[in-house]
Regions:
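Post-cleavage N-terminal segment of exported redox proteins
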Residues: 1-31, 95-157
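Sequence/structural segment immediately N-terminal to covalent heme-attachment motifs in c-type
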Residues: 10-11, 15-16, 25, 29-55, ...
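Extracytoplasmic electron-transfer domains, predominantly the class I c-type cytochrome c fold
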Residues: 32, 67-117, 124, 131, ...
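Short acidic, glycine/proline-rich loop/turn micro-motifs
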Residues: 144-146, 180-183
Length: 202
């Protein structure tokens, strides 16, 4: 690493300001599976490195479920790592998604492909289920409700026409896709994310 990036002492200052090195402590009010999932997500899985918003020092703003910013989604390296809070899928589907990169109704893309290829496919099924149990326990924020009557009719018709031409052949006219083959667009994290960056890259 070239100078001045090879100088290490500034990292000590950064660590003292931003790093929480408190050891993981299991919660007595939660199940063994939940605690195992929490440990894997917060520690070795370091899911927050991509999915948690960053502060002024590029530090993760939160480290566990006690803060609503934890895993609330963040833009990183030209992709948007979607919020993992308030997920709308079953524990079994999420565990399969972590193991295979696709499930009955969803598929992963971008850097999450690398996570599956290099990491989560090698976890035991119990560990992937534990991660799923933990993530599904995290509450999401209230969805933004939009008044469909305020959308111009011409825009709706144009959107319908474009969807029918470019999307419906694979994803079906109702957006539900085909199980284990084509991901659903309904309740899709990438499609429904506030930030469209990943959707534009798929």
């Amino acid at each position: 690493i070239p100078w001045p990036l090879s100088i290490r002492w500034p990292l000590g200052i950064w660590n003292s300001l931003f790093v929480d090195d408190t050891p993981f402590t299991p919660r007595a009010d939660k199940s063994a599976a939940w605690n195992r999932g929490a440990y894997l997500v917060q520690g070795p899985g370091h899911c927050g490195a991509c999915h948690t918003p960053r502060g002024v020092g590029m530090q993760e703003k939160a480290f566990d479920e006690r803060d609503e910013q934890f895993l609330a989604g963040e833009e990183l390296n030209g992709w948007y790592a979607a919020s993992l809070r308030g997920l709308k899928m079953s524990e079994a589907d999420l565990a399969v998604l972590l193991r295979d990169g696709r499930s009955k109704h969803a598929a992963l893309s971008g850097p999450m492909d690398e996570v599956v290829t290099n990491s989560t496919q090698y976890l035991t099924d119990d560990d992937n289920r534990a991660i799923a149990a933990y993530l599904l326990s995290l509450p999401g924020s209230e969805p933004v409700k939009r008044d469909a009557s305020k959308v111009a009719k011409a825009e709706m018709e144009n959107g319908h026409r474009l969807y029918a031409r470019y999307c419906a052949t694979c994803h079906a006219s109702n957006g539900e896709g085909a199980e284990y083959a084509v991901p659903a667009l309904k309740d899709n994290l990438t499609v429904n994310a506030d930030n469209p960056l990943t959707l534009l890259r798929v």
